[in-house]
UniProtKB/Swiss-Prot annotation:
Example of a GO MF term: unfolded protein binding
Name assigned to this protein: Chaperone protein DnaK
A biological process from GO: chaperone cofactor-dependent protein refolding
Ranges of biased composition (kind: Low complexity): 608-617
Other remarks in the entry: Expressed early during infection.
InterPro entries for this protein: ATPase_NBD (IPR043129), Chaperone_DnaK (IPR012725), Heat_shock_70_CS (IPR018181), HSP70_C_sf (IPR029048), HSP70_peptide-bd_sf (IPR029047), Hsp_70_fam (IPR013126)
Organism: Chlamydia trachomatis serovar D (strain ATCC VR-885 / DSM 19411 / UW-3/Cx)
Annotated family: Belongs to the heat shock protein 70 family.
Record Pfam families: HSP70
Factors inducing expression: By stress conditions e.g. heat shock.
Annotated region (Disordered), positions in chain: 608-660
Keyword Phosphoprotein part of the UniProt annotation: yes
Lineage: Bacteria, Pseudomonadati, Chlamydiota, Chlamydiia, Chlamydiales
Amino acid sequence: MSEKRKSNKIIGIDLGTTNSCVSVMEGGQPKVIASSEGTRTTPSIVAFKGGETLVGIPAKRQAVTNPEKTLASTKRFIGRKFSEVESEIKTVPYKVAPNSKGDAVFDVEQKLYTPEEIGAQILMKMKETAEAYLGETVTEAVITVPAYFNDSQRASTKDAGRIAGLDVKRIIPEPTAAALAYGIDKEGDKKIAVFDLGGGTFDISILEIGDGVFEVLSTNGDTHLGGDDFDGVIINWMLDEFKKQEGIDLSKDNMALQRLKDAAEKAKIELSGVSSTEINQPFITIDANGPKHLALTLTRAQFEHLASSLIERTKQPCAQALKDAKLSASDIDDVLLVGGMSRMPAVQAVVKEIFGKEPNKGVNPDEVVAIGAAIQGGVLGGEVKDVLLLDVIPLSLGIETLGGVMTPLVERNTTIPTQKKQIFSTAADNQPAVTIVVLQGERPMAKDNKEIGRFDLTDIPPAPRGHPQIEVTFDIDANGILHVSAKDAASGREQKIRIEASSGLKEDEIQQMIRDAELHKEEDKQRKEASDVKNEADGMIFRAEKAVKDYHDKIPAELVKEIEEHIEKVRQAIKEDASTTAIKAASDELSTHMQKIGEAMQAQSASAAASSAANAQGGPNINSEDLKKHSFSTRPPAGGSASSTDNIEDADVEIVDKPE
């Protein structure tokens, strides 16, 4: 089979906490691509079962029976240390552990998987979805991230793309992508707010759009607030109610928790459209008295009360974003709702309260981010003209200086790409080296901000304190990823660093993960081929047994025996888990013998036809006078030859008078 040709398309991928989506520019318009399961979004879930890796819907289907090996909402762990994810660990049934570097990783049967590897599995699924639609190999993508993702999380997302076999041309914030999708065909200048409440994160961005220019004025958010947290309040309510009713604590039962998670998500979605919903989970557990069933009614009002503190947490970031943009709520022309949680009526009511206007519901909150990513892909690929995207960094970047102080070099909401330089010096006489500690955050003291990297500038010539001139340069690319350099003016000595993800993936580790991903891809392909061959063999057995049953009396006994023997050979090959080649060979042999049934039936039909023809020619004589008394036309007998009908004409009709 010939390999697919390489596509020149840059696809857009929304790598979401709960669901992911892929889009591509086609004929100048963005198109969301449906998955092989027929859905326009794919659950961001990866599961390990029986040596197989399942992604998307197949992974979600088996989550209830395999909770410890089903990894969902892994985006909340990407680019983060184990010490930073304590609250997230409590909400998932799988095991999260620290690796040797203190990074948060997933422990599945003693094998550790990084969040980048799991993200790569989801990205591969998106890549394959696009390739199946385009009929071409896709190698380039624009991937979206929450606007409030820090440098480490952005770098980790880019690494996940590389592991998936993608050249990530740009990382762009989700609200910015949504604004692109909304404003690409709009005329005139507008100031818009993008309120993005997704599965795991909350972002608010203020943009000014007009004449093809999309300028982000400010951004803010909460990377610990999303749909998972709303599910959590329903789960906790169900646990409390069940404990009151039955005296049983389900919180330690992972299988029951996974069922409650699914039920909570379903109830949450339903309550956006109805005022109450029934939650029924039969046989949720069992005790000495027998099985127990969970049956509860949750009203919209109850849910809004349970989630009120979560909804309240969206207000402060919105106020800060407006303040940073130097705008008031009345200056905003339109508010876009993005993310599945923005469908909740109480959330929409808060948006109206904050901005003083009804939010715009004209975009699909599940697809608009992927559409915007595809448009940005079109811009980078030259397919979309006259569009300029000016993004910002979400958090200030700086270094630690004397006294443990954070000295910012690049303030938050600075437009990127950008470069900033500042001169620093030594703190002691004859200091031979300085350690550059790179920080991200808004607090005045270094220890209260996030350290995202460090490096040493050595061999500084001896000099009194304060004399050496050390120029520190912060260079931020269009992806929001930071490169730092430090140069000693006297010696010309320079040291550079690209800020790696806090997950600490080195280049050799990334390359190994790329190789592993390719290996698993080939293994999965072989497993699918083996499964297809077994399924085909099973089908062949069924068809053969049916044919033998239906035609047992019409085919030779020795052929019946041969077919039954070959049926048994195929069945045995499947049972013994023989090689794909062996099963296929046995199946092909059975297929060959199945053809003999048709041959035997044809031979029998030919014999019957010959016998019928002989009877037609040598049968009893019919008096022609008698024939004339019938009012019908004669036709050749079945199986009769053409020559036997040469002299037969339509019979004349004779009217016979009725006796009086």
